């Protein structure tokens, strides 16, 4: 439940609901933090990169809002508006989601001939998605319809946290190569 505390209005407006949602999801605005014009520009290009790349990807949701206001740990954000509920996610949708995540880094590279640390969370999320595609969803032509590794989402008392992978070092290297190939293919697509 969202409660508007700062307003004395009798009715809650749509804007107040949206502002409260953004505050909960992205964190409070950092009003006391002074951001240089250079950092604002880098963030603007980065967030625009996400939006532009997403616009050209048919499986991605439309952009709802872009902000370069720092909130939480983020220098800015691009928020999407889901068109419909997604029960199943295709390989193409996941690949395009990775491409969209890397759109910010691509925009930095194209506009500044340099990159910065602002894309670290995007890269982490893109890598995680690619890893799931390869090791969990069987979406690798090279490695086939096999699940690799243990489900790390389930924690039980007494579980052996130092358990070894259920595959060889050769397979581990192949998994790493496949993950890198997926991410780099989508980065190349974002740069286009």
What is the meaning of each model-derived region?
Residues 17-19, 23-42, 137-145:
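C-terminal helical "lid" subdomain and adjoining coupling/linker elements of P-loop NTPases
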Residues 7, 47-48:
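Generic detector of well-ordered alpha-helical packing
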Residues 40-45, 51-192:
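Soluble catalytic regions of large protease machineries
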Residues 1-16:
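P-loop NTPase motor core
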């Amino acid at each position: 439940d969202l409660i508007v505390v700062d307003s004395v209005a009798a009715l809650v407006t749509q804007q107040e609901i949206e502002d409260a949602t953004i505050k909960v999801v992205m964190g409070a605005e950092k009003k006391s933090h002074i951001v240089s014009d250079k950092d604002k520009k880098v963030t603007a290009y980065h967030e625009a990169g996400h939006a532009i790349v997403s616009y050209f990807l048919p499986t991605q949701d439309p952009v709802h809002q872009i902000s370069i206001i720092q909130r939480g740990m983020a220098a800015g954000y691009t928020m999407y508006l889901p068109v419909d509920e997604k029960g199943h996610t295709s390989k193409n949708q996941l690949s395009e989601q990775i491409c969209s995540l890397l759109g910010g880094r691509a925009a930095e590279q194209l506009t500044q001939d340099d990159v910065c640390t602002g894309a670290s969370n995007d890269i982490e999320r893109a890598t995680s998605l690619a890893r799931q595609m390869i090791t969990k969803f069987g979406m690798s032509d090279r490695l086939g319809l096999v699940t690799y590794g243990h489900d790390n989402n389930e924690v039980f008392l007494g579980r052996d946290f130092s358990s070894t992978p259920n595959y060889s070092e050769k397979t581990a290297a192949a998994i790493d190569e496949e993950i890198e190939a997926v991410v780099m293919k989508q980065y190349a697509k974002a740069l286009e």
